[in-house]
Amino acid sequence: MAATLGRDQYVYMAKLAEQAERYEEMVQFMEQLVTGATPAEELTVEERNLLSVAYKNVIGSLRAAWRIVSSIEQKEESRKNDEHVSLVKDYRSKVESELSSVCSGILKLLDSHLIPSAGASESKVFYLKMKGDYHRYMAEFKSGDERKTAAEDTMLAYKAAQDIAAADMAPTHPIRLGLALNFSVFYYEILNSSDKACNMAKQAFEEAIAELDTLGEESYKDSTLIMQLLRDNLTLWTSDMQEQMDEA
């Protein structure tokens, strides 16, 4: 590959890598685009989405791998199979160091380039939400003080995004809805605050329903899909809470 490409060429190469399902390389092309751009230069919506898709795919397969390995580890522990437990633990550590590396990579990019150069509210919310997401992914596998720090950083980023979204974006905007979805998942899965999670998801859903007629055609599909996910989570969480109350 030529050492440096033009911006359009990086976009083209990122799309090519996406088609070939070579997501690590897609990440590299988008990183080079971001670091090569002058700091004041904001990414276009297309570039921003390519960056997000690249990282989402890389982190997605690692998170799935971590969940599978962790579940095997629990099974081996319940079987008291110490030799296997030790092997699985080492393997889990390897996956965790890869997870840490990917999260650190995007978080560094967000703090050094993307958030400082974001001018429009939509971009700010997009990147702050992304920052919250990757701190949340860290909180999923870290423990002790590291988990606590990751959770605090998640909260700060989501809160900052939420403040801007509430002031400047319609309740039906897909980025604002996506933020509410992920923020509520954070409350439920990381902080174990079922009530907070349900209230946040319910409020976002109801506010969007109330303004459904303002939805533009271009974002209709995205917004209604996220609303459906909010509703699915609400259904699942309330039934889980009901079961726990019944058991108690």
From Swiss-Prot:
SUPFAM superfamilies the record matches: 14-3-3 protein (SSF48445)
Keyword check for Cytoplasm: yes
Induction (record text): By cold.
Inactivation phenotype: Increased length of hypocotyls under dark-grown conditions. Altered actin arrays in hypocotyl cells. Enhanced freezing tolerance associated with enhanced cold induction of cold-responsive C-repeat-binding factor (CBF) target genes in the double mutant lacking both GRF6 and GRF8, probably due to the suppression of ubiquitin-mediated degradation DREB1A and DREB1B degradation by the 26S proteasome pathway. Increased sensitivity to cold in plants lacking both B1L and GRF6. But enhanced freezing tolerance in the triple mutant lacking B1L, GRF6 and GRF8.
GO annotations of cellular component type: cytoplasm; cytosol; nucleus; plant-type cell wall; plasma membrane
Phosphoserine PTM positions: S70, S112, S193
Pfam families: 14-3-3
Modified residues (Phosphothreonine): T214
Result for mutant: S70A: Reduced phosphorylation by CRPK1. Impaired phosphorylation and loss of translocation from cytoplasm to the nucleus in response to cold
Role of this protein: Is associated with a DNA binding complex that binds to the G box, a well-characterized cis-acting DNA regulatory element found in plant genes. Specific negative regulator of slow-vacuolar (SV) ion channel. Mediates F-actin dynamics possibly through inhibiting ADF1 phosphorylation. Negative regulator of freezing tolerance that modulates cold-responsive C-repeat-binding factors (CBF) DREB1A and DREB1B proteins stability by facilitating their ubiquitin-mediated degradation when activated by CRPK1-mediated phosphorylation in freezing conditions; this processus is counteracted by B1L.
Family according to the record: Belongs to the 14-3-3 family.
Name this polypeptide is given: 14-3-3-like protein G-BOX factor 14 lambda
Organism of this sequence: Arabidopsis thaliana (Mouse-ear cress)
